[in-house]
Amino acid sequence: MARWTAADIPDQTGRTIVVTGANSGLGAVTATELARAGAHVVVACRDTAKGERAAARMPGSAEVRRLDLADLASVGEFAAGTGQIAVLVNNAGVMATQLRRTRDGFELQIGTNHLGHFALTGLLLDRISDRVVTVSSSAYRLGRIRLDDLNWEHRRYQRWLAYGQAKLANLLFTYELQRQLAAAGSTRTALAAHPGYAATNLQSHTESIQGRLMGTTNRLLAQSP
């Protein structure tokens, strides 16, 4: 079987696709290739200046809109300004950060990677015609959902276990969303995607010596997005 590449993306003309975190890394590449295939891409990101620079390099049609997944008010504002779309790509995320809280008080990784996307998907679901794609990671194997301490308030914070919890939540959310869509007879689908070891800014922003080492090994071992 031939290896699938971006050249195999079918024509996306007439479709609007929202990609979170599309100002850099995997999100930027995803948005670029979808725009190249004819989609109108919405670059949803916190830093709109970076988003504008990324969008300027994209072929075809792209617009930039502010979305801060660590602020549920921002998520609500973004959803309120969004019309009908074909696809939502839940890509944005943070990895192995120091213990911090979102504007709403959630631990940053579960709040940004899962809860922000959970809220966004729920608010947009009746306007999505085709699919929801959520980027997960093999790091879900590190995770355990601790509903009794989801926000790491009663135990010593461990950044990689917190990341694993968030990525496991992504997978479980996708599984349950797909189950409910199928049970309702919907033709829409919910999918999770593991990108493999890709050289992005995510690893170098882990705020640790290990993160800086990962940023270095990216150049040697990781695949290009």
PLM feature segments, named:
Residues 2-206:
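Rossmann-fold NAD(P)H-dependent dehydrogenase/reductase core
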Residues 166, 192, 212-225:
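C-terminal helical subdomain
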Residues 209:
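Short acidic-hydrophobic sequence patches enriched in Asp/Glu that either
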